[in-house]
């Protein structure tokens, strides 16, 4: 949300700098198109308000429900329970097989 607010303010600053940097003839055309720029600003504000109203969760991958958060936690708890249910093996056997970091170490491959 802060990103969108900063983006809008940045765009307005860039637009105002662009308008003041134009020669006099171009400034007149900018003033004549003031109605169009107001419509553009209103359109931008409507788009941003639409993003911020309720669909901002869809920007980050959809709505996050409590079930989505609980499922990985339950999976981790099940994995821990399964790990603890195994007979207690020595540390060497519990490690992943085939991790031979040194040439003299034991591997269970």
Curated annotation (Swiss-Prot):
One GO cellular component assignment for this chain's record is: extracellular space
Signal sequence annotation = 1-16
Give GO BP annotations, semicolon-separated.
Answer: adenylate cyclase-inhibiting G protein-coupled receptor signaling pathway; regulation of cell migration
Keywords, A to Z, come to: Cleavage on pair of basic residues, Disulfide bond, Hormone, Secreted, Signal
As recorded, the propeptide runs across 17-80
Q: Which Pfam families match?
A: Somatostatin
Matches recorded under InterPro entries: Somatostatin, Somatostatin/Cortistatin_C
> What is the disulfide pattern of this chain?
98-109
Q: Which GO terms describe its molecular function?
A: G protein-coupled receptor binding; neuropeptide hormone activity
Location (main, coarse): secreted
Subcellular location, record wording: Secreted
Could you tell me what this protein does? Somatostatin inhibits the release of somatotropin.
Q: Which family does it belong to?
A: Belongs to the somatostatin family.
Which PANTHER family does the record match to this protein? CORTISTATIN (PTHR10558:SF1), SOMATOSTATIN (PTHR10558)
What protein is this chain from? Somatostatin-2
Query: Which species is this UniProt entry from?
Result: Protopterus annectens (African lungfish)
């Amino acid at each position: 949300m802060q990103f969108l607010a900063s983006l809008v303010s940045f765009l307005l600053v860039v637009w105002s700098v662009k308008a003041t940097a134009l020669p006099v003839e171009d400034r007149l055309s900018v003033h004549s198109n003031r109605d169009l720029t107001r419509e553009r600003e209103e359109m931008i504000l409507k788009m941003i308000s639409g993003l911020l109203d309720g669909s901002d969760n869809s920007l980050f991958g959809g709505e996050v429900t409590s079930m989505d958060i609980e499922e990985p936690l339950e999976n981790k708890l099940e994995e821990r329970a399964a790990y603890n249910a195994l007979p207690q093996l020595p540390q060497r056997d519990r490690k992943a097989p085939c991790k031979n970091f040194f040439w003299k170490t034991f591997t269970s491959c």
